[in-house]
Swiss-Prot record:
Protein name: Membrane protein insertase YidC
One example GO MF annotation: membrane insertase activity
Membrane topology, as annotated: Multi-pass membrane protein
Transmembrane segments: 3-23, 28-48, 106-126, 191-211, 237-257
Protein's gene: yidC
Length: 366
């Protein structure tokens, strides 16, 4: 095990990558054997699965961000149409729209950006198992020196087991067009390497194609109509899978296995996450319908109206006035028999001057 850590290099990437791969290798080597081809192949594949499991939550955010971006496409097109000539104003309005909806485009790129250093780290670690070729950033060692030198977390014994691991003469660390460093492998057969590598390479290209196709099929019509999105869809469907097939002969067999397993994981995880999000959205719609149904009145029932109550002061005033008027009228009625004999007093009494409730007072003639 190499314990020399260089703080001014990318060792902070190389050591974690080699450690995760070493843990899985020790587990599968215990079952299959230390020099078994599939023990090393599974260690590379489970390195991918470990990374993708750690990036599960950012991947879910990426999917949600992508769907949110598709939902905002009509508003984005409206802003582009309105402020197409004013780039600065359009950028400000776009930022405002993103803030209003809590949209962060960086979250959509996080899983992809996180995989780049891991891919570079794995490529460097696999390349460091065979230092007999030299090259950029690598010492030029002899075959014996190479087997006596550790590779980050891997011990010199592990390095020897990696160089000995092959499938029908196809070493896992070799590539089809390799010309130098062949002496480091115990058994190397180029026809066997091509026979093993080409099917894996084609499977990796097919997995890339179906992964891109599944992702494009879930795009909205507005997003697919965007010229930039349409161009990226064509690249993802045809150029990227073809790039895997064309570039495969120049990459170690372990890297092709890495690419194949990464696309298989992405395909399954994408299907699961999209299904989960669709179920959540369907549950929200059903909950909204249930709430509207609970708040709606029963069929044929009249809506209940709260009774209107008059102010107490307005209700009390007529009552009091009525009481006083009734009292005055009763007093006048008791006095009327005594005044019947004198018409002058009957006309000049208080009962003649006070009008009854609701009767307009008579105007006096001047």
């Amino acid at each position: 095990m190499s314990l020399l850590f260089d703080f001014f290099s990318l060792d902070f990437i190389y050591y974690p990558v080699s450690w995760i791969m070493w843990v899985w290798y020790r587990l599968f080597a215990f079952v299959l054997g230390p020099s078994n081809f599939f023990a090393w192949a599974l260690s590379v594949m489970f390195l991918v699965f470990t990374l993708r499991a750690l990036l599960y939550k950012p991947f879910v955010r990426q999917i949600r961000t992508t769907r949110q971006m598709q939902e905002l496409q009509p508003q984005i097109k409206a802003l582009q149409k309105k402020y197409g000539k004013d780039r600065q104003r359009m950028a400000l309005e776009m930022q405002k729209l993103q803030r209003e909806h809590g949209f962060n485009p960086i979250l959509g790129c996080l899983p992809m950006l996180a995989q780049i250093p891991v891919f570079l780290g794995l490529y460097h670690v696999l390349r460091s198992f065979n230092r007999t070729t030299g090259g950029f950033g690598q010492p030029h060692l002899s075959v014996i020196e190479n087997r006596l030198t550790g590779n980050y977390v891997f011990s010199p014994v592990d390095v020897g087991h990696f160089l000995d691991a092959n499938l029908f003469g196809a070493p896992i660390g070799a590539y089809m067009t390799q010309r130098s460093g062949l002496d480091a492998f115990v058994d190397f057969s180029r026809p066997a390497l091509i026979a093993v590598g080409v099917p894996v390479m084609i499977l990796a290209g097919i997995a890339t194609y179906f992964n891109s196709r599944a992702s494009i099929a879930r795009q909205s019509a507005e997003a697919a109509a965007n010229p930039q999105t349409a161009m990226m869809n064509k690249l993802a469907l045809y150029v990227f899978p073809l790039g895997v097939v064309v570039g495969g002969p120049f990459l170690p067999l372990a890297i092709i296995l890495y690419w194949f397993s990464n696309n298989i994981w992405t395909f399954g995880q994408q299907h699961y996450v999209f299904g989960m999000i669709e179920k959540e959205e369907e549950a929200k719609k059903q909950e909204a319908v249930r709430r509207r149904a609970a708040n709606a009145p029963a069929p044929g029932a009249k809506p209940k109206r709260s009774p209107k109550t008059a102010p107490a002061t307005n209700a009390a005033a007529p009552t009091e006035a009525g009481d006083t008027d009734d009292g005055a009228e009763s007093d006048a009625s008791t006095e009327r028999p005594a005044d019947t004999s004198n018409p002058a007093r009957r006309n000049s009494g208080p009962s003649a001057r006070t009008p009854r409730p609701g009767v307009r007072p008579k105007k006096r003639k001047r």
